[in-house]
């Protein structure tokens, strides 16, 4: 099973867009401020948090005027102010009230012996249907329409109106989830975010990976990944993983015992000094110390990655940024795979966002990045639980875009109304199959790619 498309409404530049996803890799291309980060962020908000929250500023710009006009429309009618809105009025106004919405279309194989975590989302009665919709919406809580609209609000001053609206959105808006029959949009079933997260695991490799400045607190991101590996491996039920964890804990216990023995001996030497101050006195017990070591804290706080070089271990920050970037991406993928294998049986969806993987990579490495990513994924998938992640990669690299071809590229454009338009090159060039090779060559313009060849100079 896999996600075939995502529809997003009213989130920042993504006022009303649909993004088709490939089964394996989709590449997002576009200028700065074209909505690429907004895509990642709305997925992170809904599927990466236990309790999604949004602010007025997260709504698309055109929503501000919709809010204002709706308040004008309701408050202009004095009868509505004096009498609470009934159920039919709530339905009428709710349809016009802006809400941030994410719709995921899932495609599945109907011949599967069981649908696992997908089962609650399949609500149609059509034996030939192999799709279902999952809708997650951040909107006005049901039953709160009177409190949201009928309390006093200043419509004369737009600044004061926005300030009050911001408070009301925070107070009265909430997240709802439901499954929807793609053949009958009125057929719905309310579910929870917990149901969605059982089905879909979402992970992110952010653009800012803390590699650039050795003076920052983020100077050893590779070492910090070890803590994540330990946490994930600890939850694994596989015998090999449990054996590894036990060996780590045994090693730490051995060190802990040795330290405690040394501390006890040194403590005895302090007793004469303490006795001068009357300790321990009558009715006062003596004391002893015990050192307790935590494997997790040792890995996160006291473990550092070094690179052997001519007998000297160089710290992590001494390696090139491009190399560290690749290592970090690969280690994070391995961590995501371990988490997926621990929590799932291979019947779930794994969506992984990678932002700007080209950072610090030379053109040749950018050109082969997608291919290497696929090979690394295949290698990890062969280690146990079936694993077919869906990658969404946002990039400014023409080399990465050129390597994947039109089928995988979605181009983000911002129009004059400050809205994002998504150009699906797979669809746009579907009528030009015979000329696709020529068009691809025409759009490929590279120069000086030989400069970084190892033996050129």
Where are the regions that the model predicts?
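Pre-Walker A-like glycine/lysine-rich segment at the N-terminus of P-loop NTPase domains
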Residues: 1-48, 55-76
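The Walker A (P-loop) glycine that initiates the GxxxxGKT/S ATP-binding motif of P-loop NTPases
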Residues: 29-30, 317, 356, 396
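Flexible phosphate/Mg2+-sensing switch loops adjacent to catalytic phosphate-binding sites
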Residues: 48-85, 337-347, 379-388, 415-418, ...
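Glycine-rich phosphate-binding loops of NTPases
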Residues: 58-239, 243-246, 431
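Extended helical coiled-coil dimerization/tether regions that scaffold
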Residues: 199, 207, 211-354, 375, ...
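Conserved hydrophobic alpha-helix in the ABC-type ATPase nucleotide-binding domain
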Residues: 368-369, 373
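RecA-like P-loop NTPase motor core
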Residues: 381-384, 399-457
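Conserved H-loop
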Residues: 389, 395-397
